[in-house]
């Protein structure tokens, strides 16, 4: 594939995939070598991979463990983590028992504050939480505590230091209580949740909550052949490229690990490209990079055990890319959560379980400035 002079001078006009293919074919007139951030997908370093195009080109993802001073949140898993850009809000989860505490992490100060107050949601885990930018509040939905499942909605207002329970009408339609649903905030500032389960079984329905008037709407698409089966224990992110919910993997009856990627838009469900893709898994963390328009999946539990790999899903070209990290990294884990900090283009990851114990460490993942960067100048003949 040959590029014109305009494309050669301005490679950002090309998709990352087409530029990589052209570079590998030797058909570019670029004065620099561009490499796509990817690897063999095992989450670890691959010796010599930088010399093998297509099997682990050079990567610039960096992990760094943060070391805030005490006090620190107790170890936990199945919690929520959201951010307003300056602070990160950690709520709930479970260790030996469900937790109902609220902790606030200052990004600038690298410090935790226990913000637990009376009058908030009861202890729970496996709930959904999002940050409502329009109203500067954290919205919490559902979850589980022991044998109890919830479908209540709560909002935390940091400016007031208070919790508010949404007054959803008892006669109005609303989702059944559930745990482990996919959830994200859409472009209009509404909470979208899909699937999940209770002790009565798993769900395949989808709902949209409008915080402005505290109302739910059932947005489950009409029955079609193309739709995800009932499932739970997965995450959701909102793709701003096509205005849709992205949901990967999870667990269903008799199949503890799924590896399919689905998108829910106003037109219904669509299954997205599958190969290459992350191993089948549940209880992973996933965020959305709103600058580069991609979902970033981190770790989780697979048939082989806990993982600490990182995968990217390009929302524009719709393909997965495995990444590798050349620095120390978190132990493999599941039940952790992550928050995308747009202001610094970084990801913060907290807690989870490594298969032996619950954790309370916090890590920062820094993506490369660009997936395609000049590595070294190439002499022009």
Where are these regions (language model features)?
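N-terminal secretory signal peptides
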Residues: 1-18, 22-33, 38
């Amino acid at each position: 594939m040959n590029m014109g002079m305009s494309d050669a001078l301005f490679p950002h006009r090309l998709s990352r995939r087409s530029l990589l293919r052209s570079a590998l074919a030797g058909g570019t007139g670029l004065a620099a070598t561009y490499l796509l951030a990817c690897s063999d997908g095992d989450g670890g370093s691959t010796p010599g991979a930088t010399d093998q195009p297509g099997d682990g080109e050079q990567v610039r993802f960096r992990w760094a463990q943060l070391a805030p001073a005490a006090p620190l949140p107790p170890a936990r898993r199945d919690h929520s983590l959201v951010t307003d850009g300056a602070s990160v809000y950690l709520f709930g989860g479970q260790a030996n028992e469900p937790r109902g505490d609220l902790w606030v992490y200052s990004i600038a100060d690298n410090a935790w504050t226990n913000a637990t107050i009376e009058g908030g949601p009861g202890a729970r885990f496996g709930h959904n939480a999002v940050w409502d930018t329009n109203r500067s509040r954290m919205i919490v939905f559902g979850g589980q505590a022991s044998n109890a499942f919830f479908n209540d909605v709560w909002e935390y207002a940091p400016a007031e230091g208070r919790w508010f329970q949404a007054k959803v009408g008892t006669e109005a339609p609303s989702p059944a209580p559930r745990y482990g649903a996919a959830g994200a905030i859409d472009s209009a500032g509404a909470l979208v949740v899909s699937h999940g389960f209770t002790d009565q079984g798993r769900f395949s329905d989808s709902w949209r909550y409008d915080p402005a008037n505290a109302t739910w709407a059932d947005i489950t698409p009409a029955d079609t052949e193309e739709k995800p089966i009932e499932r739970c224990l997965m995450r959701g992110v909102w793709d701003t490229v096509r205005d849709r919910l992205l949901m990967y993997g999870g667990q269903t009856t008799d199949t503890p690990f799924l590896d399919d990627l689905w998108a829910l838009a106003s037109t219904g469900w669509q299954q997205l490209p599958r190969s290459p893709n992350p191993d089948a898994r549940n209880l992973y963390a996933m965020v959305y990079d709103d600058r580069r328009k991609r979902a970033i999946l981190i770790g989780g539990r697979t048939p082989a055990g806990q993982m600490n790999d990182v995968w990217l899903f390009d929302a524009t070209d719709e393909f997965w890319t495995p990444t590798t990290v050349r620095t120390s990294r978190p132990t493999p884990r599941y039940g952790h959560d992550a928050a995308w900090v747009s202001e610094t283009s970084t990801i913060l990851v907290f807690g989870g379980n490594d298969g032996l114990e619950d954790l309370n460490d916090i890590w920062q993942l820094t993506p490369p400035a660009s997936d395609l960067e000049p590595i070294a100048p190439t002499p022009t003949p």
